[in-house]
């Protein structure tokens, strides 16, 4: 008799999938198991956004309305044609670095694309750092996903309060 399939990657733990604005303020959060691939959660994160964005700009004097483009920077784990199409259908312009295969040499075109996304990726990593400062959430003790998601949303509301109301994000102090 054989054991578990070694390729099922049944990891223990959870992943936080978050969507932030360019200042790092969280707009959407989803919790999934650690073995879930990132591609499966990207559409849920975009659809779960609390603040809906406008895709048509206000007309300036003497000019007509123009379509606004919202850019979505993702890491290499989200690189697939189906993911790009889903993001485009939801009104975003995807910026996903090229995912090269082992043994391939990185082309200069792909290196520039990777650098441009990597330069914006630190905003999300900083938001994860803000989240990890909450001691109750750094290690997950809750058994139910609903309880943990509620604590994550509470922590994000505290982050939003600190950054917007107290003026930390706008450097008003």
Tell where the protein language model's regions lie, with residue ranges.
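Polybasic low-complexity intrinsically disordered regions
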Residues: 1-90, 98-99, 155, 169, ...
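A general lysine-centric signal
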Residues: 15, 143-144
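Aromatic-acidic/polar surface patches that form glycan- and anion
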Residues: 35, 144-147
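Active-site phosphate/pyrophosphate-handling residues
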Residues: 40, 128, 149
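Generic structural signal for secondary-structure transition and capping sites
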Residues: 51-54, 136, 159, 163
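Helix-centered, glycine/charged polyanion-binding patches within enzymatic domains
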Residues: 55-143
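C-terminal domain-tail junction helix/linker
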Residues: 147-173
């Amino acid at each position: 008799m054989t054991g578990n399939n070694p390729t099922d990657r049944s990891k223990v733990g959870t992943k936080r999938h978050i969507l932030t604005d360019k200042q790092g303020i969280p707009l959407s959060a989803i919790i999934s198991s650690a073995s879930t691939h990132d591609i499966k959660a990207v559409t849920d994160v975009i659809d779960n956004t609390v603040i809906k964005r406008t895709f048509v700009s206000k007309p300036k004097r003497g000019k007509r309305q123009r379509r606004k483009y919202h850019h979505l920077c993702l890491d290499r784990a989200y690189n697939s044609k189906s993911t790009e199409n889903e993001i485009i259908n939801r009104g975003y312009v995807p910026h996903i670095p090229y995912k090269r295969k082992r043994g391939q040499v990185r082309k200069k075109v792909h290196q520039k694309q990777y650098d441009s996304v990597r330069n914006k990726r630190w905003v999300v990593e900083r938001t994860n750092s803000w989240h990890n400062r909450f001691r109750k959430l750094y290690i997950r003790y809750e058994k139910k996903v609903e309880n943990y998601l509620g604590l994550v949303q509470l922590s994000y509301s505290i982050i939003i309060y600190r950054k917007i109301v107290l003026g930390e994000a706008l450097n008003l102090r």
